[in-house]
């Protein structure tokens, strides 16, 4: 049932590799340290079946850890072995998958060895407050002399009837920092010694950001 698990990794950047045909392929590098099962949820006790994974263990004295985390989290960590984690992620799985794992079990990048495609979820790069031309690709207004709305959105409504702007129109707003999932990325290589995997193409987030990797359920059409 390892195929249903999602692992927490870190985006290390991008690089180029040559495939077997000699083509240059742009790849994203994801490092995946061993993930620990921090909690098991069942339909009888929680209403659904899920596995909570913990990653990026905190290496600090016990007194320092007690100051950084609440008592509720410290008690939660003790149930899975006492190690405190910076990142906790939960994945919904089947009842058989919950029964096949135990608290404290470790899973690493080896579960993706032999997998052809994966889905990667992360937080996209923040771009700040942006206008409609950058965020939505609007054409903008005339660029000639005398024009007063070069980068404006244009008309956003009527006059006295209805006397308001309809909600849902595209306006200047904050861009980025969204939860994004890129599906069906090809796995180029899994390096068990370095605990990294290479996937073809780009993944969301900046260098060093946390991503969640899982096996693809199917090909996106």
UniProtKB/Swiss-Prot annotation:
Gene3D superfamilies: 3.30.160.810, Translation factors. GO terms for biological process: translation. It holds the Pfam family Ribosomal_L3. PANTHER family: 50S RIBOSOMAL PROTEIN L3, LARGE RIBOSOMAL SUBUNIT PROTEIN UL3C. Belongs to the universal ribosomal protein uL3 family. It comes from Chlamydia muridarum (strain MoPn / Nigg). GO terms for molecular function: rRNA binding; structural constituent of ribosome. Keywords: Ribonucleoprotein, Ribosomal protein, RNA-binding, rRNA-binding. Part of the 50S ribosomal subunit. Forms a cluster with proteins L14 and L19. One of the primary rRNA binding proteins, it binds directly near the 3'-end of the 23S rRNA, where it nucleates assembly of the 50S subunit. One of its GO terms (cellular component) is cytosolic large ribosomal subunit. This is Large ribosomal subunit protein uL3.
């Amino acid at each position: 049932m390892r195929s249903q698990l999602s692992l927490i990794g870190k985006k290390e950047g991008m690089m180029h590799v040559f495939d077997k045909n000699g083509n240059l392929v742009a790849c994203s590098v994801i490092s995946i340290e061993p993930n620990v099962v921090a909690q098991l949820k069942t339909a009888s006790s929680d209403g659904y079946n899920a596995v909570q994974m913990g990653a990026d263990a905190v290496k600090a004295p016990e007194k320092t850890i007690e100051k950084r985390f609440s008592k509720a989290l410290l008690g939660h960590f003790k149930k899975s072995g006492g190690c405190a984690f910076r990142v906790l992620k939960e994945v919904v799985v089947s009842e058989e998958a919950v029964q096949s794992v135990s608290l404290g079990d470790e899973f690493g990048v080896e579960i993706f060895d032999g997998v052809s495609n994966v889905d990667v979820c992360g937080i996209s790069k923040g771009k700040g407050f942006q206008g409609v031309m950058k965020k939505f690709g609007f054409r903008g207004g005339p660029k000639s002399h005398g024009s007063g709305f070069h980068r404006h959105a244009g008309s956003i409504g009527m006059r006295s009837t209805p006397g308001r702007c309809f909600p849902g129109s595209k306006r200047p707003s904050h861009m980025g920092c969204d939860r994004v999932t890129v599906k069906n990325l090809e796995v180029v290589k899994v390096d068990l010694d370095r605990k990294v995997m290479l996937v073809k193409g780009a993944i969301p987030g900046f260098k060093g950001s946390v991503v969640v990797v899982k096996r693809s359920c199917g090909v996106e059409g």
